[in-house]
Amino acid sequence: MKQLNSLYNSNAEELLGRVTLSGKNIFNRSAYILVTNEQNTPKGYKAIISAHDFSDKISTPCIKVDNISGFNEGDVINISPNGEVCFLYEINSASNAIFATARCNHRCIMCPQPPVQQERDRTDFNLNLIKLFDKNTQEVGITGGEPTMIGDSLFEIIRQIKKSCPKAAISILSNGVKFADIDYAAKLAACNHHDLQIDIPIFSDIASIHNHIVGAKTFYKTVQGLYNLAQFGQQIGLRVVIHKQTYKRLPQLADYIYHNFPFVTQVAFMQMETTGLAETNLKDLWIDPYSYNNELREAVLLLNDRGITTYIYNAQLCVLTPELRPFAKQSISEWKDVYLPVCDGCVLKNECGGFFSTNKNNISTHIHKIECTNSCTE
């Protein structure tokens, strides 16, 4: 998520609020954080953020930052006692998500966010956060950690999204293991959300390889979870993170998916984000994305030709062959999506997924500017 560090903070407790730039009626201010450079600082707001100094007489919590240009009307931010400002919801973003928990029942060798064993329950905080979302929000993710680790509280979050953002599609990133419990899968279905998809990773058609990658012997629980979700008519996406230990069997995995999970809504093959445990295990995981184009091509075309919607996430168009580029999606969250100087002037830059900001030291040696397409020579 996007974060700012304050230069001054008079606040001694955590504050959650919706940003307003224009001000609110005095009877409707208590949930808002006013962001302004005006010297006049009205009362009644949860906090005031400015790039100017504050008077010592102001009783409202005050936070000084370098610049207020990054704030937008309707953003939702959290201000910690140490003055860190976290953007938990951005009104202009299509990548807003609820972080359900940092706990997980897997320890994937390439996890960008290593799990914790214990933490404070976030459910009440998240329910209050969702209430501050704009009612016209089009999509909300639920992520972690492993969201099902919070048990039935997951369904409270889904119902609150449904109430506060009735138009929003929901995407849940889960390892699928908990859904091997058919009663739990039934509870998800009972939420009766109009547009909810569970995205579940599967890393190999061979159980032992998958289990090694996720750090747990759960392959068949994930498979059972997929069948239970399908039994209740849930939308399911499959995700495959590509690295040195998964790329060789991509075609076999694609064939396995087609024969065993023909009911899935989509399959996404994903370039790896090299932070967290992925960085720790980089020597065992890193392979230049250009080097697995043949395996990726075979897997993508196998599924696509058989009617399964197939995408490529987090990939740079110049690394993919022209045949694969139509499958690539801009999937990296805006706050950590960057481009390199070599990308300047590329005719496909606006369509390209870019790079994870955390991946700057681990990029393909085949990155280059595309100066023309179709019959031209790149």
Per-region residue spans from a language model:
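Flexible, acidic/Gly-rich N-terminal and inter-domain linker regions that tether
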Residues: 1-94, 284, 295-296, 304-310
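Flexible mid-to-C-terminal extensions adjoining Fe-S/redox cofactors in radical SAM and related proteins
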Residues: 11, 322-378
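Canonical Radical SAM [4Fe-4S] cluster-binding loop centered on the CxxxCxxC motif
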Residues: 89-123, 356
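Core AdoMet radical
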Residues: 111-123, 136-150, 162-180, 192-223, ...
